[in-house]
């Protein structure tokens, strides 16, 4: 039986109800956000391999609060003495996040070893009683690698976070790993290293706190 006028009943088949019609703009907005895609950092309790589409885990703590204190950008060399040349630290609340977008797999593409750059904590961050080391990995293929952080040559896992590799415009991948310390922990060791293993090859970058003062 079809409900009569004034009765609470079902909508006619094939006709969207008023509530659904009102929700269409929200549904379309949600679809646009999902299609665009955002990198979600994953907390790493141990060194592990990550690839495109790897599960993000239960951690939803954003790196915006950790790395939004200053923005990495190319320019004059104004960071600590041990910073890679061509980069500077700019104090900014804007977050530096790699965009992911739609991923395209190219099966016939040759392997490419990642270019690795290790950044020590900035002076602004140390003054705020925080210390974050950043390991940037660019131009690698395929998009699966393993990152291991070391303090004086000993692997460490506490305070490590990793982003999921994202496709670059050249069809290679980029990713970043973060090691969060206190200024006291940063100064108490002779060296910190970021070791990246990719397709049987290993790239390791090391920074010495004593050279950054």
Swiss-Prot record:
It is found in: Endoplasmic reticulum; Secreted. InterPro entries: Ig-like_dom, Ig-like_dom_sf, Ig-like_fold, Ig/MHC_CS, Ig_C1-set, MHC/Immunoglobulin. It comes from the Eukaryota. Keywords: Disease variant, Disulfide bond, Endoplasmic reticulum, Immunoglobulin domain, Secreted, Signal. Residues 1-37 form the signal peptide. GO terms for cellular component: endoplasmic reticulum; extracellular region; IgG immunoglobulin complex; membrane. GO terms for biological process: immune response; immunoglobulin mediated immune response. Residues 109-213 are annotated as: C region. Disulfide bonds join 135-194. Transmembrane segments: none annotated. Associates non-covalently with VPREB1. Interacts with SYNV1/HRD1 (via N-terminus); this interaction leads to increased IGLL1 ubiquitination and degradation in pre-B cells, possibly through a lysosomal, not proteasomal, pathway. Critical for B-cell development. This is Immunoglobulin lambda-like polypeptide 1. The gene is IGLL1.
